[in-house]
């Protein structure tokens, strides 16, 4: 009976790729060959490929067997449970050991001999498939044993408590072991007023109240900041429309609050109440001669009440400091005048 699946060769016979030829056909090939029929005639008669017939006859002449498979039989299994156990022991003792080192140890310890020792690739496959998962599990278990127990988180009611019967119940909640006790100054009760400002929502009011009570220095409360409104500032005059006066009022409103440790508002002066700067005196571009021996000095446009043109600062010039050029000029002017006359 022909198989229900397979392929058809060039001779019209059916075969299954990858499957050995049935033993009955193998025996028939050997019988026909013993009768003296040529392999090509056996191939045509049994509709088996010529290569298959030649291979079966060659194996029969060498081994005397018509069975398929390896001639010498398969290699005996070397990865026995004992070998795998020793490999696991070596890997646990030295996690960084190589496959060739494990092979040498198997030979040195007498677990295997040179005929049945596994190859380096076989040892690598054992480490990857059979021992890899177990080693990871062992490392995870040891890590869990050495890992300290996680401490419980802080209770919610110790930080955020509310003015209700929950507050009393939260105050009685014992502190879990391993967590430091929270002092009363930190575990503050939070009160929620009727207003919905950012200061009240963030709880800055209660924090600043406790800090101001515990601090020896005076610090302004948040209530003073929140109560500060536009009605505390004087209204601008109707004629104050220009940007200068508006900017001055905005500066006063901006810097009206004094932070902790800074002087009060009274020490600041608004820009509008300051007098304008005096106009600088005009300097004459001309140079006036000074009697000082240092040379030429730029004189001012004004003159002292008791000074002269040569001495604007009202200082006396001694006679010994007179210059010869000035005397000669004076004498020359007198001579010219006399000649003209």
Swiss-Prot record:
Q: Which Gene3D superfamilies match?
A: Winged helix-like DNA-binding domain superfamily/Winged helix DNA-binding domain
Tell me, in a sentence or two, what this protein's role is. Answer: Transcription factor required for normal development of thymus, parathyroid glands, ultimobranchial bodies, teeth, skeletal elements of skull and larynx as well as distal limbs.
Q: By what name is this protein known? A: Paired box protein Pax-9
Q: Which UniProt keywords apply?
A: Developmental protein, DNA-binding, Nucleus, Paired box, Transcription, Transcription regulation
Where found, per UniProt? Nucleus
Quaternary organization:
Interacts with KDM5B.
Which intervals of the chain are annotated as region RED subdomain?
82-130
Primary localisation category: nucleus
Instruction: Note whether Transport occurs among the keywords.
Output: no
- This protein's species is Pan troglodytes (Chimpanzee)
Q: Where in this protein does the record put region PAI subdomain?
A: 7-63
**A cellular component annotation (GO) from this entry:** nucleus
Residues annotated as DNA-binding region? 4-130
One of the GO BP terms on file: regulation of transcription by RNA polymerase II
Q: Which domain of life is it from?
A: Eukaryota
**Quick one: where's region Interaction with KDM5B?**
168-189
Q: Which PANTHER family match?
A: PAIRED BOX PROTEIN PAX-6-RELATED-RELATED, PAIRED BOX PROTEIN PAX-9
- The answer to whether keyword NAD applies is no
According to the UniProt entry, its GO molecular function terms are: DNA-binding transcription factor activity, RNA polymerase II-specific; RNA polymerase II cis-regulatory region sequence-specific DNA binding
């Amino acid at each position: 009976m022909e198989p229900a699946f397979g392929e058809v060769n060039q001779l019209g016979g059916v075969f299954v790729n990858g499957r050995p030829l049935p033993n009955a056909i193998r025996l028939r090939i050997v019988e026909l060959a013993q009768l003296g029929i040529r392999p090509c005639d056996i191939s045509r008669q049994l509709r088996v490929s010529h290569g298959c017939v030649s291979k079966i006859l060659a194996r029969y002449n060498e081994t005397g067997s018509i069975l398929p498979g390896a001639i010498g039989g398969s290699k005996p299994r070397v990865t026995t449970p004992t070998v795998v156990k020793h490999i696991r022991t070596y890997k646990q003792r030295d996690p960084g050991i190589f496959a060739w080192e494990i092979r040498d140890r198997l030979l040195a310890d007498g677990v295997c001999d040179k005929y049945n020792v596994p190859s380096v690739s076989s040892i690598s496959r054992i480490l990857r498939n059979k021992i890899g998962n177990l080693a990871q599990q062992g490392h995870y278990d040891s890590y869990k044993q050495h890992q300290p127990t996680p401490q419980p988180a802080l209770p919610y009611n110790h930080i955020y408590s509310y003015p209700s019967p929950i507050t009393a119940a939260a105050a009685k909640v014992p502190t879990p072991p391993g967590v430091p006790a929270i002092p009363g100054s930190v575990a503050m009760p939070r009160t929620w007023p009727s207003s919905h400002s950012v200061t009240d929502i963030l709880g800055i009011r209660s924090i600043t109240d406790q800090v101001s009570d515990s601090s020896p220095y005076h610090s302004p409360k948040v209530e003073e900041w929140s109560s500060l409104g536009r009605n505390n500032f004087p209204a601008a005059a109707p004629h104050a429309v220009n940007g200068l006066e508006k900017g001055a009022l905005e500066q006063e409103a901006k810097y009206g609050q004094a932070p902790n440790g800074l002087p009060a508002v009274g020490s600041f002066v608004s820009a509008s109440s300051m007098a304008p700067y005096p106009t600088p005196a005009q300097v004459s571009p001309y140079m006036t001669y000074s009697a000082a021996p240092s040379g030429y000095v730029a004189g001012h446009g004004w003159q002292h009440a008791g000074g002269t043109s040569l001495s604007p600062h009202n200082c006396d010039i001694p006679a010994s400091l007179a210059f010869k050029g000035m005397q000669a000029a004076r004498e020359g002017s007198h001579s010219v005048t006399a000649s003209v006359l």
